[in-house]
């Protein structure tokens, strides 16, 4: 399983420790950024989210993981890419349910929240999400999301 990971400057230090711990356990991770906590953000979260989303949609990676300060910006940006179902979670049960029920393909979270829980807890949430499976019980909902992906809206 190949994972595509990304973060913005707000999450950099915690994220890098998390990636190192995941790699030490044998996970194949492509890290698409960022490169420093000193980078000016200026929308960096959106660029990183798009890069991860594109790699997931293209099949270059099986799943994505995004982290910023809260996870909110990353989830919003990733969900702009058609076909992406980015989910925002801070705990194991919502992470599992987001895969079981909603077939999430990118997990987002916030470093500011997860630092308090620690690396091990964050890894347990990611692993629980990765090894959960879509149950197929919400096919109507998945079809509705696909229609939204295909629909064009006029921005006012």
Which residues does each PLM region occupy?
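Structural motif
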Residues: 40-50
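Short, conserved beta-strand edge motifs with alternating hydrophobic and charged residues
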Residues: 6, 30-33, 64-68
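Short, solvent-exposed amphipathic alpha-helices that sit
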Residues: 13-25
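C-terminal binding/interaction regions
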Residues: 2-13, 92-156
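Helix-adjacent hinge/juxtasegments
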Residues: 48-88
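Short, structured coil segments at secondary-structure junctions
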Residues: 25, 81-82, 102
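A short beta-strand-loop structural module common to alpha/beta enzyme folds
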Residues: 28-41
């Amino acid at each position: 399983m190949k994972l595509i990971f990304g973060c913005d400057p707000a999450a950099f230090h915690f994220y890098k420790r998390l990636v190192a711990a995941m790699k030490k356990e044998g996970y194949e991770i492509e890290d698409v950024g960022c490169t420093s906590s000193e980078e000016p953000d200026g929308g960096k979260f959106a660029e990183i989210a798009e890069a991860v989303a594109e790699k997931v949609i293209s099949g270059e990676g099986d799943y994505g993981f995004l982290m910023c300060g809260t996870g909110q910006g990353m989830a919003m940006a990733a969900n702009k890419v058609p076909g992406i179902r980015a989910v925002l979670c801070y705990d194991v049960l919502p992470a599992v349910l987001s895969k079981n029920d909603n077939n999430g393909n990118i997990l987002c979270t916030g470093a500011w929240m997860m630092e308090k829980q620690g690396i091990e807890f964050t890894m347990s949430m990611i692993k629980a999400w990765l090894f959960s499976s879509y149950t197929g019980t919400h096919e109507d909902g998945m079809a509705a999301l696909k229609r939204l992906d295909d629909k064009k809206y006029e921005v006012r």
